[in-house]
Amino acid sequence: SQFNPAAQSPSGAVSLLQLMPRTAGALGFANLTRPESSIHAGVKYLYTLRGEFQQEIPVGERTWFALAAYNLGLSGVEKARALAGRMALDPNRWAGNVEKAMAELARRGGGVEGPRYGQALLYVRAIRSLYGSYRSVPSLALANRQGEPSA
């Protein structure tokens, strides 16, 4: 969105947090043009996705899976997890496991599916990188040690 509350992607995602209108509607948000509504809807959706992985994914890993699902969709992440298992990787760990399977799906994919996996992979990698950078800022690192939620 590049911080544009009126942004619309080629796939139809809208507003600051680039939600599909149908998804936002299912979460109870009809109008995403107000930044507050867009942010609230995006956070609620990410929280909902994180809950989808509650049973099998360790707590510290759930955010990465939820972010991939936010970008790609839950079924795409499940497909990558299944491939990770077939590749003898851990389907419940992101880095070096499902991440590798997603890269393989991006490499294999034809049509629109392959690039979507690649985009989701880059999306999660970018956020993980920023997260690492923010954690290294002394005041933020201190806040994290004092009980702020981790990944």
Locate the predicted segments by residue.
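Catalytic glycan-binding domains that act on GlcNAc-containing polysaccharides
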Residues: 1-151
